[in-house]
Curated annotation (Swiss-Prot):
InterPro entries: Mediator_Med10. It comes from the Eukaryota. It comes from Candida albicans (strain SC5314 / ATCC MYA-2876) (Yeast). Pfam families: Med10. It is found in: Nucleus. GO terms for molecular function: transcription coregulator activity. This is Mediator of RNA polymerase II transcription subunit 10. Keywords: Activator, Nucleus, Transcription, Transcription regulation. GO terms for biological process: regulation of transcription by RNA polymerase II.
Length: 170
Protein backbone atom coordinates (compact mmCIF):
# COMPACT_ATOMS: atom_id res chain seq x y z
CA UNK A 1 0.00 0.00 0.00
CA UNK A 2 1.34 3.41 -0.84
CA UNK A 3 0.97 6.46 1.32
CA UNK A 4 -1.67 7.91 -1.02
CA UNK A 5 -4.05 4.97 -0.67
CA UNK A 6 -5.37 5.08 2.88
CA UNK A 7 -8.67 3.25 3.34
CA UNK A 8 -11.40 5.59 4.50
CA UNK A 9 -12.22 4.41 8.01
CA UNK A 10 -13.07 6.43 11.12
CA UNK A 11 -9.67 5.52 12.60
CA UNK A 12 -7.86 6.88 9.53
CA UNK A 13 -9.89 10.08 9.30
CA UNK A 14 -7.24 12.26 11.02
CA UNK A 15 -4.56 10.89 8.72
CA UNK A 16 -6.67 11.56 5.63
CA UNK A 17 -7.38 15.13 6.77
CA UNK A 18 -3.69 15.70 7.44
CA UNK A 19 -2.73 14.23 4.06
CA UNK A 20 -5.17 16.63 2.39
CA UNK A 21 -3.70 19.55 4.36
CA UNK A 22 -0.17 18.57 3.35
CA UNK A 23 -1.24 18.22 -0.30
CA UNK A 24 -2.75 21.72 -0.15
CA UNK A 25 0.46 23.04 1.43
CA UNK A 26 2.57 21.49 -1.31
CA UNK A 27 0.32 23.03 -3.94
CA UNK A 28 0.61 26.43 -2.25
CA UNK A 29 4.40 26.15 -2.14
CA UNK A 30 4.46 25.33 -5.85
CA UNK A 31 2.24 28.35 -6.57
CA UNK A 32 4.54 30.50 -4.42
CA UNK A 33 7.54 29.26 -6.39
CA UNK A 34 5.85 30.22 -9.64
CA UNK A 35 4.98 33.66 -8.26
CA UNK A 36 8.56 34.23 -7.09
CA UNK A 37 9.94 33.09 -10.44
CA UNK A 38 7.58 35.32 -12.41
CA UNK A 39 7.83 38.31 -10.05
CA UNK A 40 8.47 41.42 -12.11
CA UNK A 41 8.87 43.78 -9.18
CA UNK A 42 5.62 45.64 -9.87
CA UNK A 43 3.30 46.55 -6.99
CA UNK A 44 0.66 44.10 -8.29
CA UNK A 45 3.08 41.15 -8.45
CA UNK A 46 4.50 42.04 -5.02
CA UNK A 47 0.96 42.18 -3.61
CA UNK A 48 0.13 38.78 -5.14
CA UNK A 49 3.32 37.40 -3.60
CA UNK A 50 2.41 38.83 -0.18
CA UNK A 51 -1.11 37.40 -0.41
CA UNK A 52 0.27 33.95 -1.26
CA UNK A 53 2.77 34.14 1.63
CA UNK A 54 0.01 35.13 4.05
CA UNK A 55 -2.15 32.27 2.76
CA UNK A 56 0.75 29.84 3.28
CA UNK A 57 1.37 31.10 6.80
CA UNK A 58 -2.30 30.65 7.72
CA UNK A 59 -2.32 27.14 6.18
CA UNK A 60 0.78 26.17 8.17
CA UNK A 61 -0.72 27.60 11.35
CA UNK A 62 -4.02 25.80 10.78
CA UNK A 63 -2.24 22.51 10.07
CA UNK A 64 -0.15 22.85 13.22
CA UNK A 65 -3.09 23.66 15.50
CA UNK A 66 -5.41 20.96 14.15
CA UNK A 67 -2.68 18.31 14.28
CA UNK A 68 -1.91 19.03 17.93
CA UNK A 69 -5.36 19.85 19.31
CA UNK A 70 -5.65 17.71 22.47
CA UNK A 71 -9.40 18.39 22.76
CA UNK A 72 -10.29 16.96 19.36
CA UNK A 73 -9.66 13.20 19.16
CA UNK A 74 -10.55 13.23 15.46
CA UNK A 75 -7.64 15.47 14.51
CA UNK A 76 -5.06 14.61 17.18
CA UNK A 77 -2.22 12.86 15.39
CA UNK A 78 -0.20 12.00 18.49
CA UNK A 79 -1.84 8.57 18.52
CA UNK A 80 -0.07 7.68 15.25
CA UNK A 81 3.55 6.83 15.95
CA UNK A 82 6.03 7.24 13.10
CA UNK A 83 9.36 5.35 13.21
CA UNK A 84 12.36 7.67 13.42
CA UNK A 85 13.82 5.94 10.35
CA UNK A 86 10.85 7.08 8.27
CA UNK A 87 11.32 10.65 9.45
CA UNK A 88 15.02 10.42 8.54
CA UNK A 89 14.09 9.15 5.07
CA UNK A 90 11.77 12.11 4.54
CA UNK A 91 14.34 14.60 5.86
CA UNK A 92 16.91 13.15 3.45
CA UNK A 93 14.46 13.66 0.57
CA UNK A 94 13.81 9.95 0.11
CA UNK A 95 10.47 8.24 -0.38
CA UNK A 96 9.22 6.61 2.87
CA UNK A 97 7.73 3.77 0.80
CA UNK A 98 11.35 2.72 0.14
CA UNK A 99 11.79 2.29 3.92
CA UNK A 100 8.75 0.02 4.01
CA UNK A 101 10.03 -2.07 1.11
CA UNK A 102 13.52 -2.37 2.63
CA UNK A 103 12.04 -3.26 6.03
CA UNK A 104 9.99 -6.06 4.48
CA UNK A 105 13.00 -7.34 2.50
CA UNK A 106 15.21 -7.43 5.61
CA UNK A 107 12.54 -9.30 7.56
CA UNK A 108 12.01 -11.78 4.72
CA UNK A 109 15.77 -12.49 4.58
CA UNK A 110 15.90 -12.91 8.34
CA UNK A 111 12.91 -15.26 8.30
CA UNK A 112 14.49 -17.33 5.51
CA UNK A 113 17.75 -17.56 7.45
CA UNK A 114 15.93 -18.65 10.62
CA UNK A 115 13.92 -21.22 8.68
CA UNK A 116 17.17 -22.62 7.27
CA UNK A 117 18.64 -22.86 10.76
CA UNK A 118 15.52 -24.63 12.03
CA UNK A 119 15.64 -27.15 9.18
CA UNK A 120 19.37 -27.68 9.78
CA UNK A 121 18.83 -28.39 13.47
CA UNK A 122 15.93 -30.71 12.64
CA UNK A 123 18.18 -32.71 10.28
CA UNK A 124 20.95 -32.73 12.90
CA UNK A 125 18.47 -34.03 15.49
CA UNK A 126 17.28 -36.81 13.18
CA UNK A 127 20.77 -37.90 12.07
CA UNK A 128 22.19 -37.65 15.59
CA UNK A 129 19.21 -39.58 16.98
CA UNK A 130 19.63 -42.36 14.40
CA UNK A 131 23.35 -42.64 15.16
CA UNK A 132 22.70 -42.71 18.92
CA UNK A 133 20.11 -45.47 18.47
CA UNK A 134 22.58 -47.50 16.37
CA UNK A 135 25.44 -47.15 18.86
CA UNK A 136 23.41 -47.26 22.07
CA UNK A 137 20.27 -49.39 21.55
CA UNK A 138 19.34 -49.05 25.23
CA UNK A 139 18.75 -45.29 24.64
CA UNK A 140 16.29 -45.84 21.76
CA UNK A 141 13.19 -45.14 23.86
CA UNK A 142 14.62 -41.87 25.23
CA UNK A 143 15.86 -40.73 21.80
CA UNK A 144 12.46 -41.45 20.22
CA UNK A 145 10.79 -39.53 23.05
CA UNK A 146 13.04 -36.51 22.44
CA UNK A 147 12.40 -36.65 18.68
CA UNK A 148 8.63 -36.86 19.25
CA UNK A 149 8.67 -33.94 21.71
CA UNK A 150 10.72 -31.72 19.39
CA UNK A 151 8.63 -32.28 16.25
CA UNK A 152 6.82 -29.33 14.63
CA UNK A 153 3.39 -30.62 15.66
CA UNK A 154 2.14 -27.96 18.03
CA UNK A 155 -0.88 -30.08 18.98
CA UNK A 156 1.47 -32.94 19.87
CA UNK A 157 3.63 -30.58 21.91
CA UNK A 158 0.57 -29.26 23.73
CA UNK A 159 -0.59 -32.80 24.54
CA UNK A 160 2.89 -33.77 25.80
CA UNK A 161 2.93 -30.70 28.04
CA UNK A 162 -0.56 -31.54 29.31
CA UNK A 163 0.41 -35.19 29.91
CA UNK A 164 3.56 -34.11 31.73
CA UNK A 165 1.57 -31.69 33.89
CA UNK A 166 -1.00 -34.39 34.66
CA UNK A 167 1.74 -36.87 35.62
CA UNK A 168 3.37 -34.32 37.91
CA UNK A 169 0.05 -33.60 39.66
CA UNK A 170 -0.70 -37.26 40.41
Amino acid sequence: MTTGALPSTPANEPLIKSADNVANLIESFIELGVLVHDNQGTPQSNQALMNKLNQLISQLSQTSTTANDPNDANTNLKQFLIPIDVISYIEDGRNPDIYTREFIEVNAKSNARLKGKMLGFKKLRDVFGDKLKQEFPQLEKGVDDIINRTNDNSSHTASVITDTANNNNS
